[in-house]
């Protein structure tokens, strides 16, 4: 029985890639800098002491990071008994965004350039804004700028509730984000507005990767909270991913947990499981692993590392989340059967010690575990697509156009 379980620790980079300089990210190192901050006693909110990841260390995380940067992450166990195959991968795709990273993991790198709204103020073309106001019958809009999602709620949330004007904002990523109050504006209305925005961006040739619905609740600044009802409207991958091939060629199952289905625009996904928060995502993953049959991929995105800690530059929060993930990892590993493969990886970096609030261009860890997987170094993988090619070969699918089988 062949089953693969892919866990994406969203934004968990392990050192700047060779091309990081052109992204302004030379020297970024999500894992390394978190570990250093913990060792210096600078990440003692909600946790304390050196970064402790014994289970990830046994899978080779520390050694993969050392291969990536030349430095072993401080605090991790150098003498861990390695039980998995480990390496690090560079990104072939042109961006450092979520869709590019995930599509490349599934064997389809993004070799074109996304469109971006690069102006920090008055970010969106007036023609686009006018169409959205008219089609969605809006009283106007707020924002129209680059911002962190939590900051803009404190700035404009109250005005949004009074006026009914949605908050439009973007970032260094190829995104059009819309924040609206779940109760005063309405969740269904927000989703409808996002559908309209997706249509207009596509029809207008803007080449924007995602429209993101950002619903929130609360009644005043400091009390506004984003809810778990986020919804991403992505464009479809430009070629069949290994997910789609498993479904098409083997009649297989691909179970999306978290935001995976949205990232692939629902293509190649046979079942969606919604969960919010690290523990809930872990619980859902374990339940689906228990039920998984032959020719199944269970694919989970642990978004909190990125959204709650990376972008918010919360080092202690990121460290605590990694330690929580590590503590729960044995529950997941206990479910691995003889022919199963477990892959732990990431889609980009988001160094919480780095200036700004954006992603960082980094290598990702590639940790592979299973009874038939030979422990040891996988070395430097030249593309995330090596993961997709490995999974395609494991299931006996037609080869992907990019990547090499690692096993």
UniProtKB/Swiss-Prot annotation:
Q: Give residues annotated as binding Mn(2+) 1.
A: 10, 347-348
Does the keyword field hold Isomerase?
A: yes
Gene Ontology CC terms, in alphabetical order: cytosol
Q: Where does Mn(2+) 2 bind?
A: 306, 311, 359
Task: Report the EC code(s) recorded for this entry.
Answer: 5.4.2.7
Q: Where in the cell is it found?
A: Cytoplasm
Q: What is the lineage of its organism?
A: Bacteria, Pseudomonadati, Pseudomonadota, Gammaproteobacteria, Enterobacterales
What gene, per UniProt, encodes this protein?
A: deoB
The biological pathway it contributes to is: Carbohydrate degradation; 2-deoxy-D-ribose 1-phosphate degradation; D-glyceraldehyde 3-phosphate and acetaldehyde from 2-deoxy-alpha-D-ribose 1-phosphate: step 1/2
Q: Which PANTHER family match?
A: PHOSPHOPENTOMUTASE
Indicate the principal place this protein occupies in or around the cell: cytoplasm
> What's the stated role of this polypeptide?
Isomerase that catalyzes the conversion of deoxy-ribose 1-phosphate (dRib-1-P) and ribose 1-phosphate (Rib-1-P) to deoxy-ribose 5-phosphate (dRib-5-P) and ribose 5-phosphate (Rib-5-P), respectively.
State the protein's name.
Phosphopentomutase
How many cofactors are bound and how? Binds 2 manganese ions.
Asked if the record carries the keyword Manganese, the reply is yes
Q: What chemistry does it catalyse, as a reaction equation?
A: 2-deoxy-alpha-D-ribose 1-phosphate = 2-deoxy-D-ribose 5-phosphate; alpha-D-ribose 1-phosphate = D-ribose 5-phosphate
Please provide the record's keywords in A-Z order.
Cytoplasm, Isomerase, Manganese, Metal-binding
User: A biological process (GO) annotation for this entry?
Assistant: 5-phosphoribose 1-diphosphate biosynthetic process
Q: Which cofactor does it need?
A: Mn(2+)
Supply the enzyme class, top level.
Answer: isomerase
GO terms (molecular function) for this protein are:
magnesium ion binding; manganese ion binding; phosphopentomutase activity
Cite the InterPro entries for this sequence. Answer: Alkaline_phosphatase_core_sf (IPR017850), DeoB (IPR010045), Metalloenzyme (IPR006124), Phosphopentomutase_DeoB_cap_sf (IPR024052)
What does the sequence similarity comment in the record state about its family?
Belongs to the phosphopentomutase family.
